[in-house]
């Protein structure tokens, strides 16, 4: 349960408010039993982006882990030098954070040649770059609610959704989208 350490931070007063798309595990149990003074705000991914863009939600510092970044800050969820072991795909969720945060710090294990374009996050939205040994294991993205389904009904829904996208008029070279568990 990767969120369990938040309990100690809340008890110390370091975390006073949480806005999230979901809670589970020990943190959810602790909050349900009165751990926090303020209620948790639950938002869909789309509403989160809208809340940030309309100043209903403020980001002081965005820490963004990414598989590649150049020396100026152009950041991507893929690595173009052939090493795909850290690729995580679209950084759509992080793009909004980077653009609206007071400060944006990109954490990467791979600083590539300038320019790292096309990029998900442009250099103008990045304040600092920190090279680290390892950004994490992208296999961890596929866990819990994001595991691949073998359920025929869910597969049919996915196939129909893909058909809608393919026939939308927007599906062409350069098309990019990000999915979630909703």
Residue ranges and their predicted role:
Residues 1-181:
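Conserved alpha/beta enzyme-core scaffold
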């Amino acid at each position: 349960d990767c969120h369990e350490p938040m309990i100690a931070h809340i008890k110390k007063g370091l975390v006073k408010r949480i806005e999230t798309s979901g809670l589970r595990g020990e943190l959810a149990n602790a909050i349900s039993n009165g751990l926090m003074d303020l209620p948790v705000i639950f938002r869909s991914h789309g509403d989160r982006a809208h809340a940030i863009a309309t100043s209903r939600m403020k980001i002081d510092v965005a820490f963004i882990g990414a598989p590649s970044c150049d020396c100026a800050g152009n950041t991507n969820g893929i690595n173009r030098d052939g090493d795909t072991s850290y690729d995580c795909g679209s950084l759509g969720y992080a793009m909004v954070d980077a653009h609206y945060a007071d400060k944006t710090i990109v954490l990467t294990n791979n600083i590539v040649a300038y320019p790292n374009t096309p990029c998900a996050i442009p250099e103008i939205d990045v304040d600092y770059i920190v090279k680290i040994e390892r950004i994490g294991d992208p296999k961890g993205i596929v866990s819990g609610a994001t595991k691949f389904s073998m359920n025929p009904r869910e597969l049919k829904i996915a196939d129909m959704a893909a058909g809608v996208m393919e026939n939308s008029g927007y599906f062409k070279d350069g098309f990019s989208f990000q999915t979630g568990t909703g």
